[in-house]
Amino acid sequence: MGDYVPGFEQRESDNRSFGHSRLPTLGAIPIKNEKGQTVMQKVKVSRYVAGKAPEYARNYDSDSSESDRETDRDDDRRRRRRRESSDEEDRRRHRRHEDYGRRRQVEKPEVLGKVEDESSENEQESEEDEEKQEERRERARMRRLELHENNREKDEEQEDSAESDEEDFERRRQMLRDRAIKREEEIKREIKEELEEDDVEEEEEEESSEEEDSDEDDDPVPRLKPIFTRKKDRITLQEAEKEKEKEILKKIEDEKRAEERKRESAKLVEKVLQEEEAAEKRKTEDRVDLSSVLTDDETENMAYEAWKLREMKRLKRNRDEREEAAREKAELDKIHAMSEEERLKYLRLNPKVITNKQDKGKYKFLQKYFHRGAFFLDEEDEVLKRNFAEATNDDQFDKTILPKVMQVKNFGKASRTKYTHLTEEDTTDHQGVWASTNQLNSQFSTKRAGGSRPVFERPATKKRKN
């Protein structure tokens, strides 16, 4: 790629002699090819990728790259040692803090004598309070120091992570996040323990003051160190009585529930018995003759008799059909042998018998036609003898009195017809398009009509072709 840069993109910093040449910001630049022609060539934008050397840095000597790698390795080792030392310091500080938290000693029960001087006790209590306050201040100071060191370590680790690659950065960030979460949990736990200790100390002070009041008697009484009991573990006489009352009420409710279940079960048994008795009564009332039901246990004699009856009916039906066919054939032969006059006289004296014969009725004006049908008319049926020409629905009205426009079928509907009926239309009109003589009709008749096509062939040639 050439070093040509358009004039309107020229900058003072582009004329530098050090480093890689600045790439133009256009999508394509004009360059000269091998033939000397000026053509446009696309600019390949080189993007920065973490951990990958740029294009202009690949031509350097291998010695310098190896030395750079060694320095990078040394830097990584230093950072790793620094992190390990900081982690070890954190663990040591955490261990010291835990030991300090466990430093509170549990004293054994002791026999205390009678308090003689109240002023000495008050001074001792004030000294103990000051020691506790000093311990709290020391713990707070330690926490502040730890937070300050943690923040400083976070800053150092962030600087180190910015120099390393993305994987190390992610790993260190996760470690820092886990460490911060652990520290927050430890701080919360310490605060909670301190609050519990304060509560315990206050309760112990109250109990000790009560015991001191009770110990003002003449005879000294040995006293044990009071033990703190949680509120949920404390049981008083009132609570014990309430628990007994609850148990008694629960027993009474259980007894009532058991009695209700007994009554419900008795009602259910009674209902089932009644249903069984009703079913038995229905069986006795609706008892049928089981012999009328066909089963597979019939005897062979009964099956044979039934088959014999069916076979006799079939033979009789076939014989009647043969006799009827023979009679019709004989009658046809007789009619064919007669003369025309004899045939007319015979048909007049012996008319043909038509089953379900129906007289054709008269249809009204614009009445809808229904066809009776043509099948299964050889059997006598009252339905087939009805008058199918009888008007129904709208056909019962006289449509001759309607205006001429309304004398069409389905008037006012999408399926209405244009014409009233065929008898009112003139079908002999020769003025239509199909009857007029034009070029299209003449061409059609010339090509398709027989004998009208011009033929310019000699008969002799036609014979030779054949």
Swiss-Prot record:
Primary localisation category: nucleus
Tissue specificity field: Detected in intestine, pharynx, vulval muscles and body wall muscles.
Chain intervals with Acidic residues compositional bias: 118-132, 156-168, 193-219
Inactivation phenotype: Developmental arrest at larval stage L1 or L2. RNAi-mediated knockdown results in aberrant splicing of tos-1 mRNA with increased intron 1 retention and exon 3 skipping, leading to increased expression levels of tos-1 isoforms 1 and 2. However there is no obvious recognition of the cryptic 3' splice site in tos-1 intron 1.
Biased composition (Basic and acidic residues): 58-77, 97-117, 133-155, 169-192, 234-245
InterPro entries, sorted: MFAP1, MFAP1_C
Positions of the UniProt region annotated as Disordered: 1-245, 251-270, 422-466
Polar residues composition-biased segments: 434-446
GO biological process, one term: regulation of alternative mRNA splicing, via spliceosome
Subcellular location: Nucleus
Record's keyword terms, sorted: mRNA processing, mRNA splicing, Nucleus, Spliceosome
GO cellular component: nucleus; U2-type spliceosomal complex
Family as reported in the entry's similarity comment: Belongs to the MFAP1 family.
Quaternary structure (record): May be a component of the spliceosome.
Protein purpose: Involved in pre-mRNA splicing.
Name used for this protein in its record: Microfibrillar-associated protein 1
Protein encoded by which gene: mfap-1
